[in-house]
Amino acid sequence: KVEPAIRYAEVLLIYAEALNELTSGQVYHLTTYTGADVEIQRSVDEMRYAIKRIRMRAGVPDYSEETYNNPNDFRVKLKRERQIELLGENSMRYFDLRRWKDAMTEENQLLQGCNINISDDETRIADFYKQTIITSVHKVFEQKMYLWPFPTYELKRNVNMTQNPEW
């Protein structure tokens, strides 16, 4: 099966996130790969343009004006939007949590799911959908896991290279 390298929804989410992280009121001057000069700044209209395309397609309402105007509120909403929109796609959540430095909190939470060991008794079907703590899966995330270790053979090939902390 051929899978796209990147979906348009992801491009829009990346764009909105990048705009949100810019300092409000400050104009940045950049040079494109063609040599053209462009100005970029945190723009609520541009952020709304990107997010609205995704939310309209899903049939859910746009965010409030207050959300767009508050970078912290928008960041929280955007993280949730990425979690939902990119569910199950190329380990996106894995890398997002590390990029945002949220993995320590998110990945050390107890795993919850449905009770798959419930009996076939029809009177207990509703119990299947009750959230259950999965005790058989032990999740551990440590600070050192934000960076991967370099393979030993790479360290031997380059004596100037040092291993990442705690590895």
Language model segments and positions:
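Acidic/polar-rich alpha-helix caps and helix-coil junctions
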Residues: K1-W167
